[in-house]
Amino acid sequence: ASDGRNAVVHERAPELVVTATTTCCGYDPMTICPPCMCTHSCPPKRKPGRRND
């Protein structure tokens, strides 16, 4: 059932799916998932699950 949830996200905004297609290192940020998210080396600008563009 969780797969359907990811599928909806992909259909809504496929351009946001850059690295991970289903989960981001064990969790689903519902947005883009850069590799730095896995190593926690992302700059403290945008929070996972939110788009502050």
Curated annotation (Swiss-Prot):
Propeptide regions on this chain: 1-12, 49-53
Post-translational modification summary for this protein: Contains 3 disulfide bonds.
Residues the record lists as 4-hydroxyproline modifications: P14, P29, P34, P35, P43, P44, P48
Sugar-modified residues: T19, T21
Residues bearing the modification Proline amide: P48
Pfam families noted in UniProt: Toxin_8 (PF07365)
Keywords: Amidation, Disulfide bond, Gamma-carboxyglutamic acid, Glycoprotein, Hydroxylation, Ion channel impairing toxin, Neurotoxin, Secreted, Toxin
GO MF, one example: acetylcholine receptor inhibitor activity
Tissue specificity annotation: Expressed by the venom duct.
Positions where 4-carboxyglutamate occurs in the chain: E15
GO terms under cellular component: extracellular region
Coiled-coil segments: none
InterPro entries: Conotoxin_a-typ (IPR009958)
Localization, UniProt: Secreted
The protein's role, per its UniProt record: Probable neurotoxin with ion channel inhibitor activity.
Description of its domains: The cysteine framework is IV (CC-C-C-C-C).
Family: Belongs to the conotoxin A superfamily.
Name of the protein described by the UniProt record: Conotoxin Bu27
